[in-house]
Curated annotation (Swiss-Prot):
Pathway: Porphyrin-containing compound metabolism; heme O biosynthesis; heme O from protoheme: step 1/1. GO terms for biological process: heme O biosynthetic process. Gene3D superfamilies: UbiA prenyltransferase. Carbon 2 of the heme B porphyrin ring is defined according to the Fischer nomenclature. It is found in: Cell inner membrane. Interacts with CtaA. It catalyses: heme b + (2E,6E)-farnesyl diphosphate + H2O = Fe(II)-heme o + diphosphate. The keyword Transmembrane applies. This is Protoheme IX farnesyltransferase. It comes from Ruegeria pomeroyi (strain ATCC 700808 / DSM 15171 / DSS-3). Keywords: Cell inner membrane, Cell membrane, Heme biosynthesis, Membrane, Transferase, Transmembrane, Transmembrane helix.
Amino acid sequence: MSDASFNASTARAAHRPDEAGFGDYFALLKPRVMSLVVFTALVGLVAAPVSVHPFIGFCAILFIAIGGGASGALNMWWDADIDQVMKRTKKRPIPAGKVEPGEALALGLGLSGLSVMMLALATNVLAGAFLAFTIFFYVVVYTMWLKRTTPQNIVIGGAAGAFPPVIGWIAATGDMSVEPWLMFALTFMWTPPHFWALALFMRSDYDDAGVPMLTVTHGRRATRVHILIYTILLALLALGTAFSNIGGPIYLAVALVLNALFLLGAIRIWRRDEADSEADNFKTERGFFKLSLLYLFLHFGAILAEALLRPYGLGGWG
């Protein structure tokens, strides 16, 4: 983070016209990202082959959500300099001058410690340890290192967003098995095409901020090829998961439809040239990005449906 940019951001925050409200501090937690964390963690917890007391389950999801929010606050603290450059992020609390960087740091560190400690106490130490590692990986490995140094930033860094279902499973069972890692892999392989689609129509933002996204370092043509390759690998993984212990006929039906649409979208992106994209303001790329959000939620929703129906003999493969 450049000192000049950081000091400028700090100066604006120090002279902000209005005191920050609850909504400003809540925005530091990245609530939209937190919703994905909560949902995938919930699916991991419910899909586990054990009975969890509702109160323990609620506490587990709450503290995982707080840990995810803490990661978001620390991410915004560190990225304050580039957030004020990018159009997509310049209205965030710190660059907008509503919250001081030091406040975001204190909030992030405090919530990190609280979430890890309380998750370990409410469920088990292994779950708390995995949450601590996830926060560390997202903040230190991804935000502080990978994001600004390599075009593979979101490929490797995607692991941080893939851990919540694993943590949910461990919170329920106290140990690990193959199934939560299938959910991890699903999220991990989904992350690159999701963010590369965004980078196709937000390339100038990343370029201006000095973030080496694939579109900046290798161009849009190479990014389109990468999206297609990862989408094919993702489809194979998603369809294979249908025949695991967390899959079933409902999941298979959902996966067949979604992956057909996702592959079609990736092929359309791969076939487009820059003139077509510029002409319609990246309409296809924006549509693929929106579809990617639905893609992950519906896959995990299908896993959840299979898990909820399994006790009645209706979920899974019998």
